[in-house]
């Protein structure tokens, strides 16, 4: 076998070696050889290797009838792999093309693939495609099209099409250099020698899928894989070895995560093969990947130590055991001795003390010290269900999300049920709608460490800082939602946004300001109108707390049609919003309402 030296390759003149291994193949081999001779690309050599056929010389007579049109070799029987290796050692071409003695090439097989190579920068690329399945008599059964199974971009990811059973060895056009660099067929494998070698080569070689059908593959009862009794066991061993040898990096490249690769491989093996042992191994490895995935749970604490301890206890009973808890004491003034004592008892709990700067700064400190693949947040007055981390982690790995949240349950100060909030229905591409309605609650969130390292909480905001970050993340990513209550959010008078109209309205104003001051988010400023309407409504609640709320609310919304009209005037919306924010902060709600009404009469 010759190899390329350091010389430029004129691809149109490169020699392609077509190797035809045959054992007792007189019945079909003439069709195979004729299809090779009929190739429109003429710079080929056809090598026929007789693997010790025992058919009274019929195979040899057919081969010799072609004279010098082919290169014919006879050897002792050693199996298909040994026959291919014999041909490889004697080939002179720069490229290798396998043709089984019972298969057929379309006339343009080699020319078409060489044309593709000529258009590619990397001439060391392996070309492959689908095939036509035919019966013993050559009748067409169906077409096997890999692009009907995987998208084109995935068909060009080395290894993935192989591990989804989409590679037919006779469809390949492969540089011969890989036989030198990686090796040749394992002759000890009677029926899996092809996938064994392709696996080794595809780990180092680029591949290119071509949608053209260029070969006919014959399906018949005399094929080796159907006659060799231990074929299934050999396949189980082979596929199990694949799973053990693959690196995490390779799995991630193929499917986005090792867990997703393993579960999809298990599904493929279960649905398409009888290789139960390999399938069970893939499932076992997938479960282990989840078990080995560390989740960092960040709990900022400011006083209310008894609730903080309850929050910690809800984490300690999680069914997913691989976690760390980062307690960020944001300058508590209460006695924290009981809290620190609990932290010292469990090595999974890390305690940090800092001066009081608000929840955003506390969470950011946790993010900077987290080591898990994922981060989950839990406010010190809230609780996790015991299977929260397990369910959400599996959901994110299965769907390849980098951010997710769930539905939750509201409870009162004593932990009693108030209502269920199905916020988990909010999912997918939710931007820019998330600006005007953000139902994502802090203790329901889980995201990758990398995501939060690149997107910290805005520390200059103490109310609404969480929604600001969720909006920013949603503007660049799809949001995963689980409509299952996995957290409990405590509603407590005076300290909780849900129960404090002033805190709630300030949060809405902060979110609006955050959006308007961001160069990208500000393009969607009309979506902040509802935030300001809600803020104004909440502030009127404070102003009219001793009046008939229903009456005053109806009176206020008499002007609602005017506000709706603003949506069609994007050029004035930002001005109005900025004026509103400034007015509310400096002059109060009564003056602001009067100012808005006067401004609208003048400009709209």
What are these regions (language model features)?
Residues 96, 375:
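Short aromatic/hydrophobic "clamp" motif used to bind/position activated sugar donors
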Residues 1-37, 287-316:
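N-proximal low-complexity "stem/linker" segments adjacent to membrane-targeting elements
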Residues 89, 129, 143, 147-242, ...:
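Conserved nucleotide-sugar donor-binding catalytic segment
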Residues 57-60, 75-91, 112, 354-370, ...:
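Glycine-rich, basic loop-to-helix element that forms the pyrophosphate-binding segment
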Residues 33-74, 312-353:
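Acidic donor-binding segment of Leloir-type glycosyltransferases
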Residues 2-11, 161, 166, 196, ...:
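C-terminal subregions of glycosyltransferases and related glycan-biosynthesis enzymes
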Residues 108-142, 387-418:
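Conserved donor NDP-sugar-binding/catalytic core segment of glycosyltransferases
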Residues 100-104, 130, 379-383, 407:
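The conserved acidic donor/metal-binding loop of glycosyltransferases
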């Amino acid at each position: 076998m010759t190899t390329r030296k350091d010389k430029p390759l004129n691809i149109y003149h490169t020699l392609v070696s077509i190797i035809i291994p045959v054992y007792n193949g007189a019945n079909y081999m003439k069709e195979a050889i004729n299809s090779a001779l009929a190739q429109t690309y003429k710079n080929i050599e056809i090598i026929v290797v007789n693997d010790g056929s025992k058919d009274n010389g019929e195979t040899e007579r057919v081969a010799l009838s072609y004279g010098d049109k082919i290169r014919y070799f006879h050897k002792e029987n050693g199996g298909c792999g040994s026959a291919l290796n014999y041909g490889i050692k004697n080939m002179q071409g720069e490229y290798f093309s396998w043709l089984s003695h019972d298969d057929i090439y379309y006339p343009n097989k080699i020319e078409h693939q060489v044309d593709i190579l000529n258009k590619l920068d990397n001439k060391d690329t392996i070309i492959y495609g689908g095939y036509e399945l035919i019966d013993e008599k050559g009748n067409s059964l169906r077409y096997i099209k890999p692009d009907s199974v995987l998208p084109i971009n995935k068909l060009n990811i080395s290894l993935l099409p192989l591990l989804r059973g989409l590679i037919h060895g006779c469809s390949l056009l492969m540089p011969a250099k890989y036989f030198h660099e990686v090796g040749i067929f394992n002759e000890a494998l009677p029926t899996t020698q092809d996938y064994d070698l392709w696996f080794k080569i595809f780990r180092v070689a680029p591949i290119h899928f071509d949608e053209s059908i260029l070969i006919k593959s014959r399906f018949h009862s005399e094929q080796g894989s159907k006659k060799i009794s231990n074929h299934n066991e050999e396949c189980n061993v082979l596929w199990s070895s694949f799973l053990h040898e693959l690196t995490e990096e390779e799995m991630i490249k193929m499917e986005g995560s090792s867990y997703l690769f393993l579960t999809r491989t298990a599904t493929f093996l279960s649905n398409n093969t009888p290789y139960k042992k390999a399938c069970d191994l893939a499932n076992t490895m997938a479960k282990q990947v989840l078990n080995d995935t560390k989740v960092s749970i960040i709990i900022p604490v400011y006083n209310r130590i008894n609730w903080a301890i309850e929050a910690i206890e809800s984490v300690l009973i999680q069914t997913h055991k691989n976690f760390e808890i980062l307690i960020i004491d944001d300058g508590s003034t209460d006695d924290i001795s009981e809290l620190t004592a609990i932290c010292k008892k469990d090595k999974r709990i890390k305690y940090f003390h800092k001066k009081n700067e608000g929840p955003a700064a506390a969470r950011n400190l946790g993010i900077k010290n987290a080591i898990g693949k994922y981060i989950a947040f839990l406010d010190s007055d809230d609780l996790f269900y015991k299977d929260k981390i397990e369910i959400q982690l599996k959901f994110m790995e299965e769907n390849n999300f980098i951010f997710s949240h769930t539905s939750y349950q509201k409870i009162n100060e004593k932990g009693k049920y108030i209502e269920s909030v199905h916020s988990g229905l909010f999912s997918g591409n939710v931007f820019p709608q998330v600006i005007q309605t953000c139902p994502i609650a802090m203790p329901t969130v889980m995201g990758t460490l990398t995501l939060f390292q690149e997107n910290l909480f805005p520390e200059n905001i103490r109310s609404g800082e969480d929604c600001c970050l969720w909006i920013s993340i949603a503007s660049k990513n799809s949001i995963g939602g689980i409509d299952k209550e996995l957290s409990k959010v405590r509603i407590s008078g005076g300290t909780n946004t849900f129960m404090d109209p002033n805190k709630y309205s300030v949060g809405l104003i902060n979110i609006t300001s955050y959006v308007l001051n961001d160069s990208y988010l500000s393009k969607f400023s009309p979506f902040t109108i509802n935030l300001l309407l809600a803020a104004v409504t909440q502030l009127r609640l404070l102003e009219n707390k001793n009046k008939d709320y229903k009456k005053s609310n109806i009176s206020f919304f008499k002007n609602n049609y005017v506000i709706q009209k603003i949506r069609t005037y994007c050029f004035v919306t930002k001005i109005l919003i900025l004026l509103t924010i400034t007015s509310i902060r400096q002059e109060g709600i009564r003056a602001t309402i009067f100012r808005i009404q006067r401004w609208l009469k003048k400009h709209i």
